[in-house]
């Protein structure tokens, strides 16, 4: 109880019907996420033709999503059943840490997937091909940096506290301490605004490169008096463009999933009077659903 901010005490308990609905949602998304990401990892790791450097990033994305749901699904089921957090303050902090860690690793893995598509499509033969060693270094850097940022609240830079709905835990966005808020400013930049900027930059040039390529193909076909000009190289480029669309869809879904949680953090800092326990539910509902999207998108591909 000492970890719960006074702001939440002004609100009555949530409608009891919310908890069964949350439990059903978590059961549905948990099973889908664990099964989907496990199949993704198994297929990519056991199919020789799919064991490419670029697909190592896909496997890492599936692993981060699988780890998120594997560690957060059981506690959520327990708290929804008892209508409150019953697992103690220490596990509350561990729970929040793992959620932030997997979310951070997920977004930066997708940033690297996007950058790889940019390198292949925009730079083409002039770009340095992605090697297994380079992909492994990218993956290692994702986890090391994500761990460093998410460990900070354990050392006094912000803290992990129960959410207002008492079914989960996260960063303390209600604290008015300047040091605590500075963590949220920097962390928001690190896991949201900077990745978004990089992603937009890459896709602007990817779209330009694809448009220029298609125009060149049409002009060449017109000169030769045929309807289309599709040789082996063109087919390869077309496949790369298809993969880029898949990656862009996945990144877009990720930002749709995590934007509500970002808004909750910022509303908590600057307009807390508008923030009720019910609203805090939507942040992690969208965030948890994100872990289901990725295996579906890549399975279709």
UniProtKB/Swiss-Prot annotation:
InterPro entries associated with the record: GPCR_opsins (IPR050125), GPCR_Rhodpsn (IPR000276), GPCR_Rhodpsn_7TM (IPR017452), Opsin (IPR001760), Opsin_lateye (IPR001391), Retinal_BS (IPR027430)
Disulfide bonds: 92-169
Subcellular location: Cell projection, Rhabdomere membrane
Entry keywords, A to Z: Cell membrane, Cell projection, Chromophore, Disulfide bond, G-protein coupled receptor, Glycoprotein, Membrane, Phosphoprotein, Photoreceptor protein, Receptor, Retinal protein, Sensory transduction, Transducer, Transmembrane, Transmembrane helix, Vision
UniProt topology in membrane: Multi-pass membrane protein
Highest taxon, organism lineage: Eukaryota
Regions crossing the membrane: 19-43, 56-78, 93-115, 135-155, 183-204, 246-267, 279-300
One Gene Ontology term, aspect cellular component: cell projection
PTM (free text): Contains one covalently linked retinal chromophore.
Residues in compartment: Extracellular: 1-18, 79-92, 156-182, 268-278
Coiled-coil segments: none
SUPFAM superfamilies: Family A G protein-coupled receptor-like (SSF81321)
PTM sites of type N6-(retinylidene)lysine: 288
One GO term (biological process): phototransduction
CDD domains cross-referenced by the UniProt entry: 7tmA_photoreceptors_insect
Sugar-modified residues: 165
Its biological purpose: Photoreceptor required for image-forming vision at low light intensity. Can use both retinal and 3-dehydroretinal as visual pigment. Light-induced isomerization of 11-cis to all-trans retinal triggers a conformational change that activates signaling via G-proteins. Signaling via GNAQ probably mediates the activation of phospholipase C.
Family statement: Belongs to the G-protein coupled receptor 1 family. Opsin subfamily.
Subunit annotation: Homodimer. Interacts with GNAQ.
Protein name: Rhodopsin
Natural source organism: Faxonius virilis (Virile crayfish)
């Amino acid at each position: 109880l000492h970890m719960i901010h006074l702001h939440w005490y002004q609100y009555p308990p949530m409608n009891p019907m919310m908890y069964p609905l949350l439990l059903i949602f978590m059961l549905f998304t948990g099973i889908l996420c664990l099964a989907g990401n496990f199949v993704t990892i198994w297929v990519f790791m056991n199919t020789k033709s799919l064991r490419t450097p670029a697909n190592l990033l896909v496997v890492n994305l599936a692993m981060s999503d699988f780890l998120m749901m594997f560690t957060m699904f059981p506690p959520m089921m327990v708290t929804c059943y008892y209508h409150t957090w019953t697992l103690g303050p220490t596990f509350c902090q561990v729970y929040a840490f793992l959620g932030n860690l997997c979310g951070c690793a997920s977004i930066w893995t997708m940033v690297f997937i996007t950058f790889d598509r940019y390198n292949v499509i925009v730079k083409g033969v002039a770009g340095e091909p992605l090697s297994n060693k380079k992909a492994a270094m990218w993956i290692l850097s994702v986890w090391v940096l994500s761990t460093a940022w998410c460990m900070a609240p354990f050392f006094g830079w912000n803290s992990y506290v129960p959410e207002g709905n008492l079914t989960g835990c996260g960063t303390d966005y209600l604290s008015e301490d300047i040091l605590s808020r500075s963590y949220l400013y920097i962390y928001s930049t690190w896991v949201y605004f900077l990745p978004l900027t990089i992603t937009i930059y890459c896709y602007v040039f990817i779209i330009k490169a694809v448009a220029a390529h298609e125009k060149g193909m049409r002009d060449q076909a017109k000169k030769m008096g045929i309807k289309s000009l599709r040789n082996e190289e063109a087919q390869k480029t077309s496949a790369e463009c298809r993969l880029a669309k898949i990656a862009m869809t996945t990144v877009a879904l990720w930002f749709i999933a995590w934007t509500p949680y970002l808004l909750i953090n910022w509303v908590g800092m600057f307009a807390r009077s508008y923030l009720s326990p019910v609203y805090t539910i939507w942040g992690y509902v969208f965030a948890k659903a994100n872990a289901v999207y990725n295996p579906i998108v890549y399975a279709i591909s």
